[in-house]
């Protein structure tokens, strides 16, 4: 009787456990399905907020993802269900019925869960590859080994390779899963009274396991094709891509591997039928031995046959490597020119006169100091911040000028009282931009602002800003709620604030359902219960412009340095560069980031007030972007970028650095020179503001290139030979509308000695007077900050310019341009201004930059030259008198002032 009561309780407990397990499993499945559905709905309403024209992108992705997931789920469910059923049958044959496995519902639940997880992974990784495969386009370039169009490797091969690899690793997982499940169930049945591993000795269990192992080798046959094609990306020896050993040894190894694998599979099936599982294991291990043997043979062949005469063997393969790498990074279209540099003397006044536009645009303000000054004197309130200062070109009073333009964004760390109302309802946006000339400073040595202050003031011909509010920005990220019962703070005005209410296109209406959704998404219960929110309120989300673009088109890579412009209507518009990349371009050397092909094919314009996005194709020859256009026809705008924006865009620094980095080696097109690394280049170096030595970053400048008729904005970088400091070449990228993206490489003649930026920096340090002055200014509570050294081609000479900042030695000090250093062909001078430095360099007074637009008669009068010795003497006396006055040496001051007065009396 006692036993029966015990049995009843145990059976009841089992039923309860099974029911609870069943309910939990169903809840888990429902939770997964609900989570997927909720994520899709949330993504849809976010896409609608960004732009209804992008909804077609969402639905295209949704249908493809759904198709991939449904098909893969059905296949995976079948695989797991059948595998589990075989395991159940074998276990119950060995140990008898197991109550846990009595019904098939557990098998269904486990199979559904595993299939959901695996199909979800496959959907996320396969959908875009399927779309690009389906809409693939040719590059019209064939690889030299398999004679297939590059489009096959970029669009088709990745799709098939992903499927084959997924199946391969799936079967491996099933094998491991099967073994583990046998051991666990066997141990569960006997509750540790026997060795759980003993189940693996059962004939039918081993039959099941070895059947799965044979499947691995069957799928392996299909991977061989893609592994052989993968040699186009190999690094065996000195060649990127197929080399001599790859072509004659490893490719033949893969061809023979087909025969070996077929033999392994047939023998395994034969022994499987005979039940000789030990023989199957030996056959399978023999294939591993074959793989090891192939590696040994290839390595030995490379070492003993190829390496002793590698240059000869690899020559034709190096030619392929060079050709395809240059194609992949668009180096083939670089126009190479020789720059007949004149190193015989310094620059002349005539040289300057012939390059007036270039001289007028010589940059004497730098990014770090300009940004520091902006955050000191144009921030006004701690809840504003300048995150960046970007370079652009604008026509100011009829002349092209390079300017710094910086957005005054909202800074949530600086909000005075971090209440919910302040952070979400009142402090919602930044205000305006500041624009300063890169070529001029105030008498105090600070940037000359031509757009400044709050409210905005546009001076000296600068463009007017009619909508200064920045709701979407570079670092503007947290969500805010607008059109509530609380007015927004627009900008400070006296002792109070000007208020504002948003009337732009951005935002999602906060209906009761949307309030519930976003309170859950942001884990913010206050959003649900706040009485300040009404039926007109909208929530502004995805306000980071980069994340906003990624939300619509995640398949592009985006520049991390967007820049802001002022369009023809006075609205603020962000420009974000988008890149198409792949790591599947054959025979191309990859970058450190892993890709081996890049194009700047897309520019995204984002309205800073409305948050609207417009995608423009700027490289219509790029097959990758044309594939995306075929997939998503509604994503891109028809036509070109509007002229009022296009005239200000610039070639991106990111892709320029990538191309220049590759060019350091791949400018060598002769395979013998390339192999011997006879002419490796490096970027020029300079001294940073903290005194350390680093590579010169590419820099923008408005200048007239050699053989050009007018000034245009270019991005340039100098090259030096590797491990040597003389300058050997420089690369320029054009940003004008008619020449946008054209690259020109200027090479100096062999045998000419052109001082590099670092050598000029050393000359500055070694100049007795300059070194003395810099050391003196670096004392007594002040510090000297050396700006970026710029190398500028003027006629047939290289002119170097470096601004010198002086700042008080405290955190709140404003760096001010107090001196400008100029150098050319070994002569180094320092002046109180750019004109002064250039005057000393040429040995006579030069025309002030600001007077270049005067009439010819005025120009002639201005350029009448005083004797340079008198000018230098007057300047020297003035500096000595000023120094004596600062030191309180009245006797010396009187003496120098009298000498100066006497000289001035003789000046007509």
UniProtKB/Swiss-Prot annotation:
Would the keyword Transit peptide be found if you checked this record's keyword annotation? no
The UniProt entry's coiled-coil ranges are: none
This protein's membrane topology, according to the annotation, is: Multi-pass membrane protein
**Location relative to the cell:** Cell membrane
Which residue ranges run through the membrane?
A: 22-42, 62-82, 98-118, 166-186, 208-228, 253-273, 286-306
Organism, as annotated:
Caldicellulosiruptor saccharolyticus (strain ATCC 43494 / DSM 8903 / Tp8T 6331)
By sequence similarity, the record places it as follows:
Belongs to the UPF0182 family.
Q: Kindly give the PANTHER family that the UniProt entry links to this protein.
A: UPF0182 PROTEIN SLL1060
Recorded hits in Pfam families, A to Z, give: UPF0182 (PF03699)
Name this polypeptide is given:
UPF0182 protein Csac_0864
Keywords (A to Z) from UniProt: Cell membrane, Membrane, Transmembrane, Transmembrane helix
Looking at the UniProt record for this protein, which Gene Ontology cellular component terms does it annotate, in alphabetical order? extracellular region; plasma membrane
Disulphide bonds in the chain: none
């Amino acid at each position: 009787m006692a036993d029966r009561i015990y049995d009843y309780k145990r059976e009841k407990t089992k039923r309860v456990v099974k029911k609870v397990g069943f309910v939990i499993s169903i809840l888990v499945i429902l939770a997964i399905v609900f989570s997927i559905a909720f994520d899709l709905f949330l993504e849809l309403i976010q896409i609608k907020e960004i732009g209804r024209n992008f909804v077609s992108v969402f639905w295209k992705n949704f249908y493809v993802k759904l198709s991939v997931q449904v098909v893969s789920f059905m296949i995976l469910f079948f695989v797991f269900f059948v595998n589990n059923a075989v395991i159940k049958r074998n276990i119950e044959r060995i140990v008898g019925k197991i109550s846990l496995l009595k019904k098939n519902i557990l098998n269904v639940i486990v199979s559904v869960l595993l299939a959901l997880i695996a199909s979800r992974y496959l959907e996320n990784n396969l959908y875009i590859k399927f779309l690009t495969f389906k809409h693939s386009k040719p590059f019209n370039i064939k690889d030299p080994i398999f004679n297939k169009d590059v489009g096959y490797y970029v669009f088709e091969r990745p799709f098939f390779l992903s499927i084959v690899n997924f199946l391969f690793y799936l079967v491996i997982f099933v094998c491991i899963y099967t073994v583990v499940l046998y051991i666990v169930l066997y141990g569960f049945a006997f509750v540790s009274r026997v060795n759980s591993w003993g189940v693996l000795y059962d004939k039918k269990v081993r039959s099941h396991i070895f059947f799965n192992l044979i499947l691995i080798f069957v799928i392996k046959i299909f991977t061989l094709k893609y592994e052989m094609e993968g040699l186009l990306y190999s690094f065996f020896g000195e060649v990127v891509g197929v080399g001599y050993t790859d072509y004659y040894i490893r490719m033949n190894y893969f061809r023979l591997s087909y025969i070996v694998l077929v033999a392994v599979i047939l023998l395994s099936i034969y022994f499987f039928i005979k039940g000789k599982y030990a023989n199957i294991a030996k056959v399978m291990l023999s294939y591993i031995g074959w793989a090891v043997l192939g590696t040994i043979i290839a390595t030995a062949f490379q070492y003993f046959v190829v390496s002793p005469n590698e240059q000869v063997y690899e020559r034709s393969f190096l030619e392929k490597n060079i050709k395809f790498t240059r194609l992949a990074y668009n180096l083939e279209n670089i126009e190479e020119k020789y720059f007949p540099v004149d190193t015989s003397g310094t620059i002349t006044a005539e040289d300057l006169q012939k390059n007036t536009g270039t001289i007028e645009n010589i940059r004497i303000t730098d990014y770090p100091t300009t940004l520091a000054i902006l955050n000191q004197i144009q921030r006004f309130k701690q809840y504003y911040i300048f995150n960046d200062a970007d370079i652009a070109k604008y026509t100011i009073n009829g002349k092209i000028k390079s300017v710094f333009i910086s957005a005054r964004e909202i800074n949530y760390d600086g909000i005075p009282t971090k209440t919910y109302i302040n952070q979400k309802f009142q402090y919602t946006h930044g205000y305006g931009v500041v624009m300063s000339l890169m070529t001029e400073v105030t008498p105090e040595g600070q940037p000359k602002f031509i757009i400044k202050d709050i409210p905005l003031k546009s001076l000296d011909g600068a463009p007017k800003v009619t909508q200064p509010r920045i709701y979407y920005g570079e670092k503007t990220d947290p969500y805010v709620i607008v059109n509530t019962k609380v007015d927004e703070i627009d900008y400070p005005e006296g002792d109070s604030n000007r208020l504002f209410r948003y009337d732009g296109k951005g935002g999602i209406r906060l209906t009761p359902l949307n309030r519930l959704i976003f309170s859950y998404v942001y884990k913010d219960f206050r959003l649900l219960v706040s009485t300040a929110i009404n039926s007109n309120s909208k929530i502004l989300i995805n306000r980071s412009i980069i994340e906003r673009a990624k939300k619509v088109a995640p398949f592009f890579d985006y520049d991390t340095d967007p820049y802001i412009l002022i369009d023809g209507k006075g609205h603020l518009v962000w420009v974000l560069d988008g890149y198409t990349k792949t790591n599947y371009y054959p025979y191309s050397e990859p970058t450190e980031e892993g890709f081996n092909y890049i194009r700047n094919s897309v520019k995204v314009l984002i309205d800073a007030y409305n948050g609207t996005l417009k995608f423009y194709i700027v490289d219509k020859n790029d097959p990758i972007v044309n594939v995306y256009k075929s997939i998503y026809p509604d994503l891109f705008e028809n036509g070109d970028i509007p002229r009022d924006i296009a005239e200000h865009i610039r070639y991106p620094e990111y892709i320029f650095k990538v191309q220049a980095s590759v060019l350091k080696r791949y400018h060598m097109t002769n395979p013998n020179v390339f192999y011997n690394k006879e002419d490796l280049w490096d970027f020029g170096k300079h001294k940073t503001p903290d005194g350390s030595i680093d590579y010169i970053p590419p820099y923008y400048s408005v200048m007239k290139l050699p053989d050009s008729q007018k000034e245009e904005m270019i991005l340039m970088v100098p090259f030096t030979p590797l491990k040597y400091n003389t300058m050997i070449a420089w690369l320029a990228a054009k940003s004008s509308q008619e020449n946008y993206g054209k690259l020109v490489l200027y090479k100096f003649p062999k045998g000419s000695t052109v001082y590099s930026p670092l050598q000029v920096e050393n000359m500055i340090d070694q100049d007795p007077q300059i070194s003395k002055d810099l050391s003196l200014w670096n004392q007594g509570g002040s510090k000297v900050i050396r700006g970026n050294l710029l190398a500028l081609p003027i006629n047939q000479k290289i002119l170097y310019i470096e601004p010198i900042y002086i700042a008080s030695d405290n955190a709140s000090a404003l760096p001010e341009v107090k001196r400008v250093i100029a150098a050319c062909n070994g002569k180094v001078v320092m002046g109180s201004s750019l004109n002064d430095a250039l005057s000393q360099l040429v040995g006579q007074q030069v025309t002030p930059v600001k007077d270049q637009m005067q009439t010819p008669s005025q120009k002639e009068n201005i350029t009448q030259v005083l004797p340079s010795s008198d000018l230098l003497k007057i300047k020297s006396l003035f500096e000595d008198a000023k120094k004596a006055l600062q030191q309180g040496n009245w006797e010396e001051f009187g003496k120098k002032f009298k000498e100066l007065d006497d000289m001035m009396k003789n000046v007509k």
